Amino acid sequence: MRSKKIRNIPPYNIDSIFNALVLGVKDYVTKNNFTKVVIGISGGIDSALVSAISKVALGGKNIYGFALPSEYNSDESLKLAKNLSDNLGFKLGELSIKKIFNENISLLYSTLFKDLKWDIAEENLQSRIRSNLLMAISNKFNYLLLSTGNKSEMSVGYSTIYGDLSGGPVSYTHLTLPTNGTV
Protein backbone atom coordinates (compact mmCIF):
# COMPACT_ATOMS: atom_id res chain seq x y z
CA MET A 1 0.00 0.00 0.00
CA ARG A 2 1.28 3.43 -0.91
CA SER A 3 1.41 6.13 1.68
CA LYS A 4 -0.42 9.30 0.85
CA LYS A 5 1.49 12.49 0.52
CA ILE A 6 0.92 14.94 3.31
CA ARG A 7 -0.31 18.18 1.86
CA ASN A 8 1.01 21.49 3.01
CA ILE A 9 -1.55 23.63 4.75
CA PRO A 10 -1.11 27.31 3.97
CA PRO A 11 -0.78 29.79 6.83
CA TYR A 12 -3.90 31.48 8.10
CA ASN A 13 -5.22 34.37 6.07
CA ILE A 14 -6.20 36.80 8.81
CA ASP A 15 -8.46 38.87 6.54
CA SER A 16 -10.43 35.80 5.49
CA ILE A 17 -10.78 34.63 9.08
CA PHE A 18 -11.88 38.07 10.27
CA ASN A 19 -14.43 38.36 7.44
CA ALA A 20 -15.81 34.92 8.29
CA LEU A 21 -16.15 35.94 11.95
CA VAL A 22 -17.96 39.13 10.93
CA LEU A 23 -20.34 37.16 8.74
CA GLY A 24 -20.92 34.67 11.57
CA VAL A 25 -21.85 37.40 14.06
CA LYS A 26 -24.07 39.26 11.61
CA ASP A 27 -25.82 36.05 10.62
CA TYR A 28 -26.29 34.83 14.20
CA VAL A 29 -27.62 38.17 15.43
CA THR A 30 -30.08 38.68 12.57
CA LYS A 31 -31.31 35.07 12.48
CA ASN A 32 -32.13 35.37 16.18
CA ASN A 33 -34.19 38.51 15.51
CA PHE A 34 -31.85 41.00 17.17
CA THR A 35 -30.42 44.20 15.75
CA LYS A 36 -28.20 45.21 18.68
CA VAL A 37 -25.76 43.49 21.00
CA VAL A 38 -24.45 44.00 24.52
CA ILE A 39 -20.89 43.00 25.38
CA GLY A 40 -19.10 42.87 28.73
CA ILE A 41 -15.98 45.00 28.24
CA SER A 42 -13.05 44.11 30.48
CA GLY A 43 -10.27 46.02 28.76
CA GLY A 44 -8.74 42.72 27.62
CA ILE A 45 -8.15 41.10 24.25
CA ASP A 46 -11.27 38.88 24.25
CA SER A 47 -13.81 41.67 24.66
CA ALA A 48 -11.77 43.86 22.27
CA LEU A 49 -11.89 41.20 19.56
CA VAL A 50 -15.62 40.54 20.00
CA SER A 51 -16.21 44.32 19.91
CA ALA A 52 -14.16 44.77 16.73
CA ILE A 53 -15.96 41.91 15.00
CA SER A 54 -19.33 43.30 16.12
CA LYS A 55 -18.43 46.82 14.95
CA VAL A 56 -17.81 45.61 11.41
CA ALA A 57 -20.80 43.25 11.47
CA LEU A 58 -23.37 45.61 13.00
CA GLY A 59 -21.91 49.11 13.29
CA GLY A 60 -20.88 50.88 16.48
CA LYS A 61 -24.34 52.33 17.11
CA ASN A 62 -25.68 48.79 17.54
CA ILE A 63 -23.24 47.84 20.30
CA TYR A 64 -23.72 48.59 23.98
CA GLY A 65 -20.59 47.77 25.93
CA PHE A 66 -20.53 47.51 29.70
CA ALA A 67 -17.60 47.63 32.08
CA LEU A 68 -18.54 45.91 35.34
CA PRO A 69 -15.59 46.50 37.66
CA SER A 70 -15.10 45.15 41.15
CA GLU A 71 -12.55 46.21 43.71
CA TYR A 72 -10.11 43.82 42.02
CA ASN A 73 -10.07 45.61 38.66
CA SER A 74 -7.39 48.16 37.89
CA ASP A 75 -7.98 51.71 36.70
CA GLU A 76 -6.02 50.68 33.60
CA SER A 77 -8.72 48.13 32.70
CA LEU A 78 -11.38 50.85 32.75
CA LYS A 79 -9.16 53.17 30.72
CA LEU A 80 -8.65 50.44 28.10
CA ALA A 81 -12.41 49.78 27.98
CA LYS A 82 -13.07 53.50 27.42
CA ASN A 83 -10.39 53.71 24.71
CA LEU A 84 -11.93 50.70 22.98
CA SER A 85 -15.41 52.21 22.97
CA ASP A 86 -14.07 55.56 21.73
CA ASN A 87 -12.05 53.92 18.94
CA LEU A 88 -14.89 51.67 17.77
CA GLY A 89 -17.66 54.20 18.31
CA PHE A 90 -19.95 52.30 20.66
CA LYS A 91 -21.65 53.39 23.86
CA LEU A 92 -19.94 52.23 27.06
CA GLY A 93 -21.79 51.99 30.35
CA GLU A 94 -20.25 51.25 33.71
CA LEU A 95 -21.83 49.41 36.62
CA SER A 96 -19.70 48.63 39.64
CA ILE A 97 -20.31 45.15 41.03
CA LYS A 98 -18.38 45.92 44.23
CA LYS A 99 -21.46 46.33 46.45
CA ILE A 100 -23.31 43.29 45.02
CA PHE A 101 -20.19 41.14 45.29
CA ASN A 102 -19.48 42.19 48.88
CA GLU A 103 -23.11 41.55 49.89
CA ASN A 104 -22.92 38.05 48.40
CA ILE A 105 -19.61 37.38 50.15
CA SER A 106 -21.01 38.61 53.49
CA LEU A 107 -24.05 36.38 53.15
CA LEU A 108 -22.01 33.31 52.19
CA TYR A 109 -19.35 33.78 54.88
CA SER A 110 -21.92 34.46 57.59
CA THR A 111 -23.54 31.11 56.83
CA LEU A 112 -22.25 28.42 54.48
CA PHE A 113 -18.63 29.52 54.00
CA LYS A 114 -17.93 30.18 57.68
CA ASP A 115 -14.36 29.07 58.52
CA LEU A 116 -13.56 28.29 54.87
CA LYS A 117 -10.76 29.96 52.92
CA TRP A 118 -11.15 32.08 49.81
CA ASP A 119 -10.79 30.14 46.56
CA ILE A 120 -12.15 29.85 43.04
CA ALA A 121 -15.78 30.01 44.23
CA GLU A 122 -15.37 33.70 45.07
CA GLU A 123 -13.53 34.42 41.82
CA ASN A 124 -16.28 32.77 39.77
CA LEU A 125 -18.94 34.65 41.72
CA GLN A 126 -17.72 37.93 40.19
CA SER A 127 -18.12 36.54 36.68
CA ARG A 128 -21.59 35.24 37.45
CA ILE A 129 -22.71 38.57 38.92
CA ARG A 130 -21.51 40.30 35.74
CA SER A 131 -23.39 37.76 33.64
CA ASN A 132 -26.63 38.30 35.58
CA LEU A 133 -26.43 42.06 35.06
CA LEU A 134 -25.57 41.73 31.36
CA MET A 135 -28.47 39.32 30.85
CA ALA A 136 -30.82 41.77 32.60
CA ILE A 137 -29.64 44.52 30.22
CA SER A 138 -30.06 42.13 27.30
CA ASN A 139 -33.63 41.30 28.31
CA LYS A 140 -34.67 44.86 29.15
CA PHE A 141 -33.37 46.44 25.94
CA ASN A 142 -33.74 43.46 23.58
CA TYR A 143 -29.99 43.29 22.90
CA LEU A 144 -28.27 39.97 22.32
CA LEU A 145 -25.53 39.31 24.87
CA LEU A 146 -22.40 38.11 23.09
CA SER A 147 -20.01 35.81 24.90
CA THR A 148 -16.36 36.79 25.09
CA GLY A 149 -15.10 33.30 25.97
CA ASN A 150 -12.53 31.70 23.69
CA LYS A 151 -11.25 28.25 22.84
CA SER A 152 -7.95 28.71 24.67
CA GLU A 153 -9.76 29.39 27.94
CA MET A 154 -12.37 26.69 27.40
CA SER A 155 -9.79 24.04 26.55
CA VAL A 156 -8.03 24.45 29.89
CA GLY A 157 -11.16 25.04 31.95
CA TYR A 158 -10.37 28.71 32.54
CA SER A 159 -13.90 29.95 32.04
CA THR A 160 -16.99 30.17 34.19
CA ILE A 161 -20.23 28.40 33.34
CA TYR A 162 -23.07 30.93 33.76
CA GLY A 163 -20.36 33.60 33.87
CA ASP A 164 -18.11 34.59 30.98
CA LEU A 165 -19.54 31.76 28.87
CA SER A 166 -22.99 33.39 28.96
CA GLY A 167 -24.37 34.87 25.79
CA GLY A 168 -24.60 34.13 22.12
CA PRO A 169 -21.56 32.39 20.74
CA VAL A 170 -19.22 34.48 18.69
CA SER A 171 -17.64 32.19 16.16
CA TYR A 172 -14.14 33.19 17.25
CA THR A 173 -14.56 30.85 20.21
CA HIS A 174 -13.29 28.15 17.86
CA LEU A 175 -9.94 29.90 17.52
CA THR A 176 -6.98 29.59 19.81
CA LEU A 177 -5.67 33.08 20.45
CA PRO A 178 -1.95 33.75 20.55
CA THR A 179 -0.59 34.49 24.00
CA ASN A 180 1.42 37.50 22.88
CA GLY A 181 -1.68 39.65 22.42
CA THR A 182 -1.57 39.83 18.63
CA VAL A 183 -4.73 39.09 16.74
Kindly give the residue locations of the regions a language model identified.
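Short beta-alpha connecting loops at secondary-structure transitions
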Residues: 6, 65-68, 114-122, 164-172
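Conserved small/polar residues in nucleotide/adenosyl-binding loops
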Residues: 173-179
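ATP-dependent adenylation/pyrophosphate-handling site
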Residues: 35-41, 45-82
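Conserved helix-loop functional segments at active or binding sites
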Residues: 26-35, 56, 60-63, 103, ...
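RNA-binding accessory domains that recognize and position tRNA/RNA substrates
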Residues: 1-38, 56
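A conserved beta-strand->alpha-helix junction
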Residues: 62-67, 73-121, 127
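Glycine/Thr-rich phosphate-binding loops that ligate phosphate moieties of nucleotide
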Residues: 134
